[in-house]
């Protein structure tokens, strides 16, 4: 989840089909995809929900959040307002699924010269909301996209008790 145009759909497309498009098309509602990955000796199926970042779709988003195992929150490293809005996204998530594990993703890491987000502000949010972890990605180059989803799967699997 996150503001519009932060790269949520691009991250998912990069992970699922190893593709990237420069053309921005706003997501409408919710798009669901799944991806299998090998985790230790287990095959894990991730069901990934791409939810529109536009306020018009808030009610749709909340209908789909129940039963979610983890929320990935994405902001744009070149747009400080998208980081500032993360707490609003967390409040929306917690209204439906309190205490869900959260992951914070700073996207567009390839735009090094355009970066405007302060790393201390990121650190404060990670600590305040006790995020699973924070990672910077580039959907355009593919940097850290696969590790993002692998790390989510690993954290979720390690939290499952063996009984």
Residue ranges and their predicted role:
Residues 1-163:
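TRAFAC-class small GTPase G-domain
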